[in-house]
Amino acid sequence: TAGMLTGCGSDDKAKDKDAYRQYGINCIENGSYDDAVDAFQKALDQSVGSVGAEELDICYYKAKAQYLSGDVDGAIDTYTAIIDYNKDSDAYYLRGCIYFAKNDSDKGLKDFKTALSENDDNYELYLGVYETLSKYGMNDQGKEYLDNALKLKAKTADDYMQRGRIYTMLGDYDSAIKSLQKAIDEKLVKANYYMGEVYQKKGDNDSSQKYFKKYLDSGEVDSYELMNMGQAQMDNGNYDTAITYFQNALELESVPNKQQITKAMIIAYEYSGDFATAKSKMEEYMKDYPDDEDAAREYQFLETR
């Protein structure tokens, strides 16, 4: 793709920028993170000094690709450049997440606090901070952020949905259901997904599947949510249903977590007893992701079945 591109006039540069950006996104989805970084940099090179919403969007993608490629310091530098330009709360939050991954919790916490000071009524930001702190063993500190989020006043259907998510994380399922129902009553389709999660945690698989199906039928579902639905079915031993969710995810136009979904689907085939399909899918997987050592060992096992 890159070899076909030329940068002549400004219109050509705009087309090149869009093409490089899309190529970079495709590379991320295929696990080719170094190629993605190169593509995003080439996209930025077409901008000739101008910085707008599209350039910032490309910078976010570039930082993500850098992190996934193992260039943690490069990702930090890219987020820092965004922060220097416009103090964006998302950049502070994402840089904070990387600091935690580097075991630098002090810098991470500082970035989280700055992110929330820039955007203190963003429920998703509070949720993201909680999930990161919980991941790194700071669950109690994370819950303080959730408690602070619940002090905000819900104004929109999305606010009620986010509050439902928070109550779910705190284990207050009755309050979660009440908040999510308000969002559903206001026609926010995605709230059905989180309602399904609540009932899943309550052990009510029938109700969980009812809400998951409502969301699935809406056509708004993304690959991460479909993977979570599939994993929930795996946990309940419903491997054929799980495979259907994974297949639906892989058929979407954008599948940034393609590798994880494909791997989960292979395991589902294996658990269902369909070793022939599991082996066939694993052969395809190994061609696409030859560096996955765990998958190589799993393939050796499947060859013996």
Where are these regions (language model features)?
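Canonical tetratricopeptide repeat
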Residues: Q22, E54-D57, Y61, L68, ...
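Structural marker of alpha-solenoid helical repeat scaffolds
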Residues: Q46, S50, D84-Y85, E118, ...
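Register position in tetratricopeptide repeats
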Residues: E29-N30, L68, A101-K102, K135-Y136, ...
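C-terminal motif of bacterial Sec signal peptides marking the signal peptidase cleavage site
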Residues: M4-G7
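Start-of-helix register in tetratricopeptide repeats
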Residues: D18, G52-D57, D90, E124, ...
